Design a protein with these regions (language model features):
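Negatively charged, low-complexity tracts enriched in Asp/Glu with abundant Ser/Thr
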Residues: 1-20
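Mixed-charge, Lys/Arg-enriched low-complexity segments
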Residues: 44-92
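N-terminal cationic amphipathic segment used for targeting or macromolecule association
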Residues: 4, 33-35, 53, 59
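Generic detector of leucine side chains in alpha-helical contexts
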Residues: 1, 13, 32, 39, ...
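Periodic aromatic/glycine/histidine/acidic cluster detector
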Residues: 20-26
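Generic alpha-helical secondary structure signal
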Residues: 12, 22, 37-40, 72-73, ...
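Generic preference for hydrophobic/aromatic residues in regular secondary structure cores
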Residues: 3-5, 25, 67
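Short aromatic-glycine-(Arg/Gly/Cys) micro-motifs in beta-strand/loop hairpins
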Residues: 26-50
Length: 92
């Protein structure tokens, strides 16, 4: 079981196609936190991945998720809207 603890709007104007995406933070039954982005980024193989982060606190999971997102968009300079996909609204 996981409980949604928080949802954050993250503004990133340099790489993201719309300047903003969301991160949800979940807490599991062991008290650990996981963050997931609602934006998915293409990798070198053409597969899409969302940013995922972990932590012992809500804040550390959020920071780790943002760091993972920035790592996902660091492998090339010129990003197009087609390089991103959005999670289903019902999933987020």
């Amino acid at each position: 079981l996981e409980k949604v603890i928080a949802e954050f709007d993250v503004w990133e104007l340099n790489k993201s196609p719309y300047g903003k995406f969301k991160i949800k933070i979940f807490q599991d039954t062991k008290g650990l936190y996981t963050g997931y982005s609602n934006i998915q980024v293409i990798d070198e193989t053409g597969s899409f991945y969302c940013a995922v982060g972990y932590g012992d606190t809500e804040e550390s999971a959020l920071n780790d998720t943002i760091k993972h997102y920035l790592k996902l968009v660091s492998w090339k300079e010129d990003w197009q809207e087609s390089d991103f996909e959005w999670s289903e609204g019902t999933d987020f």
